């Protein structure tokens, strides 16, 4: 490329001078693919409900990764595994059961196009249409602010949760910390909402994680939750 020299943070590690463009450039790529066919696995566990066993709340996170996966997906998967451990131990100690059935899922082959979760949804579509109440997804997590998107039928419910859970860094509620950031937002709508109310608004779900099969294929109420930036 031609044009001005790129600032230091924009430069890569090649022994060339990085420019910002515009300008003519030709690039030659040599691509190699692995076409091996290998099995992939979903791991499913159920805790049957005491009153409404045929109503399912499904909790999922994928277990595959491009590399070592410490951030994506392990930072989300360990949370789901801890939820399952706590609930199972509590049930053993007290005899407690959830009113609805909880389905815990660790999905395979998310990175290759949501294969594990979508294939499971397609295989069990009739049963899911009858029984699935909601799907709750996590993926990669980090430090920062609570972020959630989902079906807006869940917004009032999640607003109550966000106002009752303490943020692990600041000691205020998770909703209050999000509001403190939004009050300084450059987006006028976000800032205006924060000035008027502490209500936690769910963003719309896009695509790219394992809620897609549930939400976009079958129209099941869904949510994606995480912490970050």
Regions found by a protein language model. Give the residues of each.
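Short, contiguous, pocket-lining structural segments
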Residues: 36-37, 71-75, 150, 206
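Soluble metallo-hydrolase cores and metallopeptidase-like ectodomains found primarily
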Residues: 1-70, 85, 89-91
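Solvent-exposed alpha-helices and their adjacent loops that cap or buttress functional pockets
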Residues: 36, 50-51, 96-98, 127-129
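Alpha-helical metal-binding/catalytic segments enriched in His/Glu/Asp
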Residues: 43, 59, 63-114, 119
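Metal-dependent peptidase/peptidase-like ectodomains
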Residues: 1-9, 19, 52, 107-229
């Amino acid at each position: 490329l031609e044009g001005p020299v790129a600032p230091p943070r924009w430069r890569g590690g090649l022994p060339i001078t990085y420019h910002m463009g515009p300008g003519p450039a030709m690039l030659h790529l040599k691509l190699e693919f692995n076409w091996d066919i290998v099995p992939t696995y979903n791991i499913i566990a159920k805790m049957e409900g005491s009153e409404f066993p045929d109503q399912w709340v499904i909790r999922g996170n994928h277990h595959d990764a491009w590399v070592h996966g410490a951030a994506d997906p392990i930072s989300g998967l360990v949370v789901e595994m801890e939820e399952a451990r706590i609930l199972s131990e509590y049930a053993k100690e007290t005899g407690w059961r959830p009113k609805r059935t909880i389905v815990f899922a660790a999905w395979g082959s998310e990175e290759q196009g949501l294969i594990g979760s979508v294939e499971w949804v397609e295989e069990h579509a009739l049963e899911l249409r009858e029984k699935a109440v909601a799907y709750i997804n996590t993926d990669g997590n980090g430090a920062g602010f609570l972020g959630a998107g989902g079906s807006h039928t869940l917004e009032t419910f999640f607003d109550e949760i966000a106002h009752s859970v303490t943020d692990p860094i600041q000691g205020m509620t998770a909703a209050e910390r999000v509001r403190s950031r939004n009050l300084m937002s450059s987006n006028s709508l976000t800032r205006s909402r924060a000035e008027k109310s502490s209500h936690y608004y769910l963003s719309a779900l896009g695509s790219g994680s394992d809620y897609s099969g549930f939400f976009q294929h079958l129209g099941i109420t869904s949510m994606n939750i995480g912490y970050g930036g």
